[in-house]
Amino acid sequence: MQANSRAYFLLIAFISFGLVGFALYLQFEKGYQPCPLCIMQRFAFIGIGLFSLLAVIAQNTRSLWQGLGMLSGVGGIAVAVYHVSLLLNPKASCGIDPLENWVNALPTAKVLPQVFYSDGLCTAPLPPVLGLSVPAWSLIWLFILTLTLAVGLIRREKNFR
């Protein structure tokens, strides 16, 4: 069980970081400029990945890290749902996103601007990836990863009862 749970969390971390890597590929190779909501979704994926790695390292507090990973996922899902809704109804956006100043003022945007600096519009029409928008894919993956963490936590709690 120990090796299985390590592999489980490592896989979640690998997928999470891989998706951030894919976002960077889209940014640097395909010219997709990240908007503030995109950056916030990156934070969610990074949170899921980091908390999953901590669950591998700190076995005694694994449920805590798993729960924080789920919380990161739920926050990311909320942002992705809002982002998809903006894409479906672009008139709901005023074109100027006040969130951009806040995201760009975060220390991460100063330290790693290539990854965390936002200079795109949330309603900018970008080419789809395999038929879906990037925020839609983000929503799907955030849901899958969060659900996977939740199911693992529920199964773990049942085993301790």
UniProtKB/Swiss-Prot annotation:
It is a multi-pass membrane protein. It comes from the Bacteria. GO terms for biological process: protein folding. The chain crosses the membrane at residues 9-25, 44-58, 64-81, 137-155. Residues 26-43, 82-136 are periplasmic. Gene3D superfamilies: DsbB-like. Keywords: Cell inner membrane, Cell membrane, Chaperone, Disulfide bond, Electron transport, Membrane, Oxidoreductase, Redox-active center, Transmembrane, Transmembrane helix, Transport. The keyword Cell inner membrane applies. Disulfide bonds join 35-38, 94-122. One of its GO terms (molecular function) is protein-disulfide reductase activity. Residues 1-8, 59-63, 156-161 are cytoplasmic. It is found in: Cell inner membrane. Belongs to the DsbB family. Required for disulfide bond formation in some periplasmic proteins. Acts by oxidizing the DsbA protein. This is Disulfide bond formation protein B. It comes from Cupriavidus pinatubonensis (strain JMP 134 / LMG 1197) (Cupriavidus necator (strain JMP 134)).
